[in-house]
Amino acid sequence: MYNNSNSNNNNGSRKRSSPPLYINNNNSGNYISPPSPLSPKQTNNFLFNNGGFNSFENPQQQSPPQQQQLLFTSPIPTRPQNLYQYIDENELNTGYNNSNNNNNNNNNNNNNNNNNNNNNNNNSNNNNNSNNNNNNKMITTTTTTTTKSNNDYKKKIKKQINFKLDNLHESSEEEEEEQQEEEEEEEEKEELNYINNNNNKNDDDNNSQDEDKEEDKYHETNTDFGLLSVASKEDLMICLNVLKKEMGQFKNLSQNLLSRLQILENGIGQEKMIRLLNNNNNYNMNGSSDSSDSSNSSGHSRNNSDENMIDCYYVTRNNNNNNTNSLLIPPAPPQLQQQQQQQQFYSQDAVMISTYLLEVQKIVEKQRQYDSLLAQREKYWDIELNKITMAILNKLGPNPSTTVDLLNLPMNNMNINKNNNSNNNNNNNNHNYNKNNNNNNNNNNDFSNFNNDDCFYNSNNSCNSEDFDSFTALNNINNSIIRNQSSNSLNLKDDSEETNFNSLKSKTNNIFKRFYIYLFGTKKTITFWKKVAIIAIIVIVWPLIANLTYKFIVYLINKRRLAKTQPFIIGNNNTSNYNSSTAIGKSLKPIKSSILVPSSSSLPSSSSSSSSTSSSSNLLLPSSINNGTNAFKKIKSSLMKKNSDISSGVGNVVSSVASNVVGGSGSGVGAPDFVKAFIQGVSTGDGGSNDNLTNNALSSITNTFGNLNTVANSSIAPSIGSGLIGSSISPSSSSSSSSSANTASNIINNFTPSALSQLNLPGSSSSSSSFSNPVSSIANNFMSDSNRSPSSSSSSSSSTSDSENGMLKLVRNLLTHR
């Protein structure tokens, strides 16, 4: 407890925010020791004992000043966040001004203090002895302290750090009595704690030894603190790179902190030596105990019985147990001058100490920042491990052969042991894990978001800050993996297909890249001649190859087209017909091309032809070939249109043959082949290669034709016979030639398949040996018969027979030449 009295010179009270840098009173040799920095060596050379220079002995003894004892109160925690507060420079300045204001008030009380030196020396010796005993007790008791709740811990830290200068010259006697009572109570508590701790010391040692053995066994079997089976080399390299990076950062930070702490320790050691030398010099110069050196160093300490105390700081102060008579003695002027000089000296020392304290606080702040950074890095490591394990599970499938066995690790047992250790913290104060857990209990602010991150852990079981560490983080990761494994197995097929596609794509890209580099090279490997060769290939060789390839393709297409359009040879196997057919086939074009005009030499002459026959044939076949073809087309169209009138006889055969030949549905002969056969028949008189069809048609005609009487008596005879006989037998002979030609043309145009199929003319068995032009032969035969018309009724029968013979020839030629 501290007496926070208000100064009269200041308007109002000062806030308890900054620690005292020095004590400004008559005995200015007393000062406050700085806080212990966070050093891994845990140096004992950092702090002074009893808060600074102790008072001298009685002037009669003339003993040298007591050597200062080093104080180490408690082990330094591994992660002490927020142990100290940063002291603002303004607060330091205000504290310095307040101390200067108090100097003026303290000068008025110098006489009282000087007159009571002898009385205070005895008290100071007693107090020093008690303080030394207290120090020894504190060294043993603070090593067995344990943690409580976070609120109590923060309050104690504030009590240790946030204190201010006590205005010792204005303290009243009542306040001093209260303080003495409190000190006595504290001493009693310390004694009780010391007794209790001694009783429990043996039990603590036994428990700690057993736990140390168990821990050593665990570390021997599990040196990596978590086995992670990695499926591929790439995942292993990712983990190693992350750890390597973090280890480098940790190493740099730790080296920086150690170097700064070493510099600070060296500076404080030098300051200590300077103070000792100055104190010895002042003692030798005075020769006797001055009032400034006869201070009562009773050594007011903090509550040493507090269980959560980490470092004990001693603030020495004067216990002004002055009587009323001491106020009347005036101070000596030389002593006053010496006191002023000493105050100036210690004011300079206070400035130096303040700089060191600021440096220490900066290092502490840096350590706190590093702790927060380390917490973030631990979170990042856990996230990366979670991603890697999930990726491995996705690759291995729902039932992998090698799994990430995090459940069977002994870390679960480790967590149980750690929980038991947290329950037995009062008996296990020297355990490193317990210290880390204690610090995590007090510094759970950095891990609060990490523990309660439901999105990351995906669990409703929140982690307590007391039990949280890397092992619990791995357990939470393991739980999230098991929980998400069923959902990830549904998307495993799509992921595998995507990975296969990506791998195939990467392989093709690599192959193309290697081929390109092999041909063209890179910017560094390509040469001038290689560039020239590439340009020559692109500009010269490639167009030539393309042109030759194009010509070859065109040649193949034309050859195939010519093979399809090769002429189909029709006719007898004689040389003349074959040559003529090939000549016609080579000269043919598509269907719309012009038809060749047959020469007069190709038409064989008949021995029975006469001048009248040639004249009549000229009437029917003009010089233009188009008229002949038009006449034949009319015959063909009439045959095609009226082929359905008669269902028996030769008409069926003729109609079927005509439909098959024209339509091409059954024979498979194309239109160009039909045209070729038609032109060949017109030009040569040959009826085509289908001789069997012609012979069958003639045989069917001979078999179906009856005698003339049946035809005359039939129903079709009047329709044909009247037109034939009536027109052919005319009484007038003057117009015989013209009427005969007109009659022949009309008969030819009026013939139908139905009429021809039922004609039964005599002499049908005799076939003409000459295959002349059908139109010309029909006209010649018919005209010769019509010119020989009888003049009397006696010759009517002979003329009728001649007309029938001409009609038979006409039908034979029509059936033969289609």
Curated annotation (Swiss-Prot):
Q: Where is the sequence biased in composition, kind Acidic residues?
A: 172-190, 205-214
Looking at the UniProt entry, the stretches that span the membrane are 534-554
InterPro entries to which the protein is assigned, alphabetical: Glucose_repression_reg
Q: Where is the stretch described as Disordered?
A: 1-68, 92-150, 164-220, 284-306, 415-445, 779-808
Q: Which keywords does this chain's UniProt record carry?
A: Membrane, Transmembrane, Transmembrane helix
Q: How is the protein disposed in the membrane?
A: Single-pass membrane protein
Q: Does the keyword Membrane apply?
A: yes
Q: Where in the cell is it found?
A: Membrane
Where along the chain is composition biased (Low complexity)?
Answer: 1-33, 44-68, 97-150, 284-302, 784-803
Where does it primarily localize? membrane
Give the CC-aspect GO terms. membrane
Q: What is this protein called?
A: Putative uncharacterized protein DDB_G0280071
Protein source organism: Dictyostelium discoideum (Social amoeba)
